[in-house]
Amino acid sequence: MKNEDTLVWTPKQVVEKFISAFNSMDKNLLDQIWASPCVFMIGNQTNVFEKYSDAVDFNNILESGWKYTKINWIEDRYKSEDICLLRFNFSRFSKEEEEEELNNYTVSHLLRMLGDKWKISALIMDETSGMSGVASR
């Protein structure tokens, strides 16, 4: 049995691990999953952050009533040996007793093979409204 740290995750698994780390608000793991620096292209704005934890504001996200995020679908758009573009849709759900979808987004992640690991390098989103708590500072 392989140690999870030595396992080479596929790009889709990296995005799934990202959502899991996001749900845990684990900034250290998020910084390991994302490349440094990381780029956020939202609408016509581009922001570069030294690390992912600089781009996310969990207090802002929690204030929206957020409890967790779930991937609805994910698809390959392009893949080579060292670059992969994934497009996926996800929903943010509330922390109320009755589960409520707060937001639904479709984004793309550009992943690069850095060393022997896939890392997320960029988020690309068409919507100019962006996402609360992410790259909004």
Please name every model-derived segment.
Residues 71, 85-87, 120:
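Hydrophobic residues on conserved beta-strands that form the core of alpha/beta folds
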